Regions:
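Active-site metal-binding loops of divalent metal-dependent hydrolases
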Residues: 107
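Active-site-adjacent loop and "lid" segments of alpha/beta metabolic enzymes
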Residues: 2-11, 16-22, 26-27, 31-90, ...
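Short acidic capping loops at alpha-helix termini that bridge into adjacent secondary structure
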Residues: 10, 97-100
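Conserved C-terminal portion of the radical SAM core fold
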Residues: 94
Length: 191
């Protein structure tokens, strides 16, 4: 993180759920902490507050090694909205300025392909939570459920999903194919 911070004029995001890694990352020049567990581990909330960094709160059902084993929701979009709303309340309760916080619905993290597409179709519901919505749809396996393509052949579909997400309220798009995604978004925004 230190080397990246010294060589690049950009915000460095560190993906971690471990409070000690959060603290060290903040000391080394990270600009954003991205926690797939939504800052739920012991001491994660306070460590995030103490860091002063921007935060990305993500939804994930289950744990990484079991999250894709029969994920179940009563209503995938409402359940995720409620989870993120509760996490935002917890962040605020420890003194975190919510202007520092973005939310990520966690496409592909404890969701079936059908649940991911339902989430994308109704993504604007999450915009109502008042925080910028970040999406990571690039090369996701949900694409292969429709197109049956390996990850390296999912660029066009990934760009299409990014456009759909922005149209439905996403403000930050995580992408593998940055140039293609940026070109498509630039063209889309001209109309």
């Amino acid at each position: 993180v230190e080397a990246l911070d010294q060589h690049y004029d950009t915000i460095i995001s560190v993906d971690t759920s471990t409070p000690s890694v959060m603290s060290e990352s903040a000391k080394c020049g990270a600009g954003l902490l991205n926690d797939v567990r939504g800052f739920q581990r012991p001491q994660a909330l306070q460590t995030a507050a103490d860091s002063g960094l921007a935060l990305c709160v993500m939804h994930m059902q289950g744990e990484p090694d079991t999250m894709q084993t029969a994920p179940t929701y009563s209503d995938v979009v409402q359940d995720i909205a409620e989870f993120l709303s509760q996490r935002l309340a917890h962040l605020g309760a420890v003194g975190i300025d919510l202007d520092r916080v973005v939310i990520d619905p966690g496409f592909g993290f404890g969701k079936t392909a059908e649940q991911n597409f339902e989430l994308l179709a109704r993504l604007e519901v999450l915009s109502n939570l008042g925080q910028p919505v970040l999406v990571g749809l690039s090369r996701k396996s949900m694409i292969s459920s429709v197109l049956d393509r390996p990850p390296e052949q999912r660029m066009v579909a990934s760009v299409a999903l990014a456009l759909m997400a922005v149209e439905r309220g996403a403000r930050i798009v995580r992408a593998h194919d940055v140039g293609a995604t940026l070109d498509a978004l630039s063209m889309w925004q001209t109309t």
